[in-house]
């Protein structure tokens, strides 16, 4: 297995692109399949065992909701 370097990327998408990615994620979750997504040139394979959560942050007049998917590689 290759040793991957640390990475922290935030990518903006149009509403249509974001909806498409969420729809593919929902379809994968419902069917019990792994989810694949390409972000900034790297293909990411999200395993079925991943943990999903939603985070809400507020600071001053700015608010943020993050849909998070977490897992550990073996």
Where are the model-predicted features located?
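N-terminal acidic leader/helix
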Residues: 2-30
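N-terminal intrinsically disordered, cationic/polar leader segments
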Residues: 2-8, 34-38, 42-74
């Amino acid at each position: 297995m290759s040793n991957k370097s640390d990475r922290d990327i935030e990518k903006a998408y149009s509403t249509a692109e974001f909806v498409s990615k969420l729809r593919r994620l929902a379809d994968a979750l419902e069917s019990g399949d792994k989810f694949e997504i390409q972000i900034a040139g790297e293909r990411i394979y999200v395993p079925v065992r991943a943990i999903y959560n939603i985070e809400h942050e507020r600071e001053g007049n700015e608010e943020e909701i993050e849909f998070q998917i977490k897992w550990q590689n073996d």
